[in-house]
Amino acid sequence: MRIVINGFGRIGRLVLRQILKRNSPIEVVAINDLVAGDLLTYLFKYDSTHGSFAPQATFSDGCLVMGERKVHFLAEKDVQKLPWKDLDVDVVVESTGLFVNRDDVAKHLDSGAKRVLITAPAKGDVPTFVMGVNHQQFDPADVIISNASCTTNCLAPLAKVLLDNFGIEEGLMTTVHAATATQSVVDGPSRKDWRGGRGAFQNIIPASTGAAKAVGLCLPELKGKLTGMAFRVPVADVSVVDLTVKLSSATTYEAICEAVKHAANTSMKNIMYYTEEAVVSSDFIGCEYSSVFDAQAGVALNDRFFKLVAWYDNEIGYATRIVDLLEYVQENSK
């Protein structure tokens, strides 16, 4: 599979890192970003959160060079001018965060790409896939797909375990979310909402999120049953989902733990992880699981009403699932 990465920010860089780390058969042929290639090479090599990577990487003749591997840098703002046909691109990993509307993303197809994977919640009629939850519903005819958000990738596997074992009447989710590149280091104006412009490392900032509602895109039985909000907090990486849920059938917290533990060792293996350790957020920096269920943190009010907690590295965990989905698409498009 020949892919290009459109947008070499946090997620774009970590997708490339994970492809190289696992020696994936995926071939990255180009990166399109308006930032200078030598600076992007530097940012790829040195990461303040996840440490240095590919120390032998250099910038030469407009390429990111790693031994025998060369990835061409492009800096084209107009999607319709990108040379995807000439490069024989199978999939565009759309990770700018700017193109999430189906009509906008379709311009990659007009430029010659065979498929587009949006690394964000999509707008419009775009199939959404979460590994371990509904990825097997992928149809090769789907030429524009979404991997949802990092938070949906954490919440949806947990919701599926609950749905399959106990049923879900309704639920509210809060994600206590690490700071992201859209936030300001110091107070300033925000286009999205006033509070979002306040200093990221001085404040706990309430924010909106569609992550809980998006679970209904991959688990239709839960459409209209989940919603939620976010608190942006002053940490660089790792977030946590707090799910307050009313189940359809009576059970115990211990039974929920057993159901999650079983799923983590079987159907959700490599997607979910179960822990009874006294963990904190920094313990999960670099964690490749989508959802780490914290058995010590949850509580029960009665036999149908529970608060459940799951951790996730909102960067590495999500980037890993993108690579998983790419490889799944490759295997199931032949």
UniProtKB/Swiss-Prot annotation:
It catalyses: D-glyceraldehyde 3-phosphate + phosphate + NAD(+) = (2R)-3-phospho-glyceroyl phosphate + NADH + H(+). It is found in: Cytoplasm. The active site is at C150 (nucleophile). Its main location: cytoplasm. GO terms for cellular component: cytoplasm. The keyword Ligase does not apply. Keywords: Cytoplasm, Glycolysis, NAD, Nucleotide-binding, Oxidoreductase. CDD domains: GAPDH_I_C, GAPDH_I_N. Its EC number is 1.2.1.12. D-glyceraldehyde 3-phosphate binds at S149, C150, T151, T180, T209, G210, R232. It holds the Pfam family Gp_dh_C. The record marks H177 as: Activates thiol group during catalysis. GO terms for molecular function: glyceraldehyde-3-phosphate dehydrogenase (NAD+) (phosphorylating) activity; NAD binding; NADP binding. Pathway: Carbohydrate degradation; glycolysis; pyruvate from D-glyceraldehyde 3-phosphate: step 1/5. NAD(+) binds at R10, I11, D33, K77, T119, N314. InterPro entries: GlycerAld/Erythrose_P_DH, GlycerAld_3-P_DH_AS, GlycerAld_3-P_DH_cat, GlycerAld_3-P_DH_NAD(P)-bd, Glyceraldehyde-3-P_DH_1, NAD(P)-bd_dom_sf. The keyword 4Fe-4S does not apply. GO terms for biological process: glucose metabolic process; glycolytic process. Belongs to the glyceraldehyde-3-phosphate dehydrogenase family. Homotetramer. Catalyzes the oxidative phosphorylation of glyceraldehyde 3-phosphate (G3P) to 1,3-bisphosphoglycerate (BPG) using the cofactor NAD. The first reaction step involves the formation of a hemiacetal intermediate between G3P and a cysteine residue, and this hemiacetal intermediate is then oxidized to a thioester, with concomitant reduction of NAD to NADH. The reduced NADH is then exchanged with the second NAD, and the thioester is attacked by a nucleophilic inorganic phosphate to produce BPG. This is Glyceraldehyde-3-phosphate dehydrogenase. It comes from Chlamydia trachomatis serovar D (strain ATCC VR-885 / DSM 19411 / UW-3/Cx). The lineage of its organism: Bacteria, Pseudomonadati, Chlamydiota, Chlamydiia, Chlamydiales. The gene is gap.
